[in-house]
Every structure is written in C-alpha cells, then in structure tokens.
Amino acid sequence: MAISQERKDEIIKEYRVHETDTGSPEVQIAVLTAEINALNEHLRTHKKDHHSRRGLLKMVGRRRHLLNYLRKKDIQRYRELIKSLGIRR
C-alpha cells in the first residue's frame, strides 16, 4: 500500500523546486499521487477494505486542496504539474 522510501526520494528529486525542497506543493502533490495510485491498486484486489478506502478519500481530499492552492498561487506551475502527473482536472 505505502510507497517505499526510495520511490519517495525519486519523486522528491524529480519535482523539487530547489536542492533542499521537500515541502513545496509540487512535491507534496506528487508524493500523494504516488500513494493514491498504490492504494488504488490495493483496493482493486481488496474490494472490502473500507479502512483503506477512507484513507484514500482523505488523501484525495488533501491533494485536491493542495492543487487548488497551487492553482490560485501560480497557474503555470499548476498546469505543468497536472500535465506531468497525468491528473485529469
């Protein structure tokens, strides 16, 4: 279900704004997207895992809030991010 630390580090390196960046909206959204995708795969095989489904919904909501924030703050960075992540919005 959870993504490995190595995969998380790869995502951070790919989406960071500067060398020590771990908390920018782009990084947070990219990590959440990877976790959401992993949890979706888990829920495809374990359809009755309602506890994980609730966690998935919370992650989707958190990602939505971060995307809204980024869209208000910098529309160009927002568009580049959703294009690179393949998020339908």
From Swiss-Prot:
<keyword id="KW-0699">rRNA-binding</keyword>
<comment type="subunit">
    <text>Part of the 30S ribosomal subunit. Forms a bridge to the 50S subunit in the 70S ribosome, contacting the 23S rRNA.</text>
</comment>
<dbReference type="InterPro" id="IPR009068">
    <property type="entry name" value="uS15_NS1_RNA-bd_sf"/>
</dbReference>
<dbReference type="GO" id="GO:0022627">
    <property type="term" value="C:cytosolic small ribosomal subunit"/>
</dbReference>
<protein>
    <recommendedName>
        <fullName>Small ribosomal subunit protein uS15</fullName>
    </recommendedName>
</protein>
<dbReference type="GO" id="GO:0003735">
    <property type="term" value="F:structural constituent of ribosome"/>
</dbReference>
<dbReference type="Pfam" id="PF00312">
    <property type="entry name" value="Ribosomal_S15"/>
</dbReference>
<keyword id="KW-0687">Ribonucleoprotein</keyword>
<comment type="function">
    <text>One of the primary rRNA binding proteins, it binds directly to 16S rRNA where it helps nucleate assembly of the platform of the 30S subunit by binding and bridging several RNA helices of the 16S rRNA.</text>
</comment>
<dbReference type="InterPro" id="IPR005290">
    <property type="entry name" value="Ribosomal_uS15_bac-type"/>
</dbReference>
<keyword id="KW-0694">RNA-binding</keyword>
<dbReference type="GO" id="GO:0019843">
    <property type="term" value="F:rRNA binding"/>
</dbReference>
<dbReference type="InterPro" id="IPR000589">
    <property type="entry name" value="Ribosomal_uS15"/>
</dbReference>
<comment type="function">
    <text>Forms an intersubunit bridge (bridge B4) with the 23S rRNA of the 50S subunit in the ribosome.</text>
</comment>
<keyword id="KW-0689">Ribosomal protein</keyword>
<dbReference type="GO" id="GO:0006412">
    <property type="term" value="P:translation"/>
</dbReference>
<comment type="similarity">
    <text>Belongs to the universal ribosomal protein uS15 family.</text>
</comment>
